[in-house]
Amino acid sequence: MVSEITHKSYPLHFVLFPFMAQGHMIPMVDIARLLAQRGVKITIVTTPHNAARFENVLSRAIESGLPISIVQVKLPSQEAGLPEGNETFDSLVSTKLLVPFFKAVNMLEEPVQKLFEEMSPQPSCIISDFCLPYTSKIAKKFNIPKILFHGMCCFCLLCMHVLRKNREILENLKSDKEHFVVPYFPDRVEFTRPQVPLATYVPGEWHEIKEDMVEADKTSYGVIVNTYQELEPAYANGYKEARSGKAWTIGPVSLCNKVGADKAERGNKADIDQDECLKWLDSKEEGSVLYVCLGSICSLPLSQLKELGLGLEESQRPFIWVVRGWEKNKELLEWFSESGFEERVKDRGLLIKGWSPQMLILAHHSVGGFLTHCGWNSTLEGITSGVPLLTWPLFGDQFCNQKLVVQVLKVGVSAGVEEVTNWGEEEKIGVLVDKEGVKKAVEELMGESDDAKEIRKRVKELGQLAHKAVEEGGSSHSNITSLLEDIMQLAQPNN
């Protein structure tokens, strides 16, 4: 066992740097716990507000004896021209704050350097989010290997790798509507230029920030990926080859959450009582409920949210609808009451205004479908729970994840969204799927057609394989062992 080797020969000390966004921090905290369970000393470096978000989960982990500590560094907001109170990416109210936010983040280099000079034992390895390129300078200065965490799947990472190597593909497209085929891929997959998370034109200061991230990616020792070999074998192998063998699939990391409290409190505290939510689910038939959640930074226009609501109503199926960023959606709240929507669906629709205990909901036997924005955390949690997916991608890696889910894995149905909804530009897009489209897609996913039955069968199988992957002897469990052995060799005092 690596945990025994770790203690007896040379104590490993990993320093983790999560990016300050909910979807990035959640898996990084899970990774911290997985490594600590193997006897690795873990130090998480983050800001006070972000540390508070995970206080309960980490306190339980520390009380159970796991060697985890948190070091807080103050974000230099004022010096970077960032208004106070914008310590997390998902709290930014305007795209104009993006550049000052990343400036503030990269200014953490100096205080973090001082921390490293005083750390004991000396760190053996850094695990850093892709969005924190300054950690490469720390790794170089202290001669420590840096492992990168992107928060994406191997399908998406390999797609980006191929397109970076063949930039002319995107550059030669005549318009943003034109489709292209990704070359050298195991499956035939088509995208438009905006659908891939690889910007061909980025203005001014934002371009420099992006280039720093790409450069830091190239110089990292390796990459850990929150996926499992059995889910996307051809893409996991292809990406590992692209990284000269230094890529480890260690997921689904969410499966380290064994107890109800940990499942319910990943990230922000849920805005619904856990028991109330489970009681509501218990009252529904097996596989009958559609769970609807479009992510932590989704703010679709009111016109689209109305169509989504009316489509859910007309589907005649029970549903849970999570509306996050609730304070931004006051008009929707008014529409719920004034139009009579909330009253009409009260017997079969549960509206959660804020944060939901997503893992608990997806694991419940009455849930038979998940309408998702295809963020990788949500996508993987759905598959791991054996729940078929109804895909509604918005931006970033989400169209890549949709292609994997619908075309390659065949565990979901597309809602029909083809156009990218960039953050801050939602109103320009308007309605992409009307109520009839929503109703049709729900029926396609949750009906009794042969295709729907096949999707349900396939996702159940992949869910079972996910649980096997993280058990002792499973692919992800073995990959963590391999990673630790690799770092242990590098960390020996005579190296």
Curated annotation (Swiss-Prot):
Keywords: Glycosyltransferase, Transferase. InterPro entries: UDP_glucos_trans, UDP_glycos_trans_CS. Its EC number is 2.4.1.368. The active site is at residues 24, 129. The keyword DNA repair does not apply. An anthocyanidin binds at residues 24, 396. The keyword Calcium does not apply. One of its GO terms (biological process) is saponin metabolic process. It is an enzyme of class 2 (transferase). It catalyses: oleanolate + UDP-alpha-D-glucose = oleanolate 3-O-beta-D-glucoside + UDP + H(+). UDP-alpha-D-glucose binds at residues 358, 373, 376-378, 381, 397-398. Pfam families: UDPGT. GO terms for molecular function: UDP-glucosyltransferase activity. Belongs to the UDP-glycosyltransferase family. The monoglucosylated hederagenin 3-O-beta-D-glucoside is a feeding deterrent of the yellow-striped flea beetle (Phyllotreta nemorum). This is UDP-glycosyltransferase 73C10. The lineage of its organism: Eukaryota, Viridiplantae, Streptophyta, Embryophyta, Tracheophyta. The gene is UGT73C10.
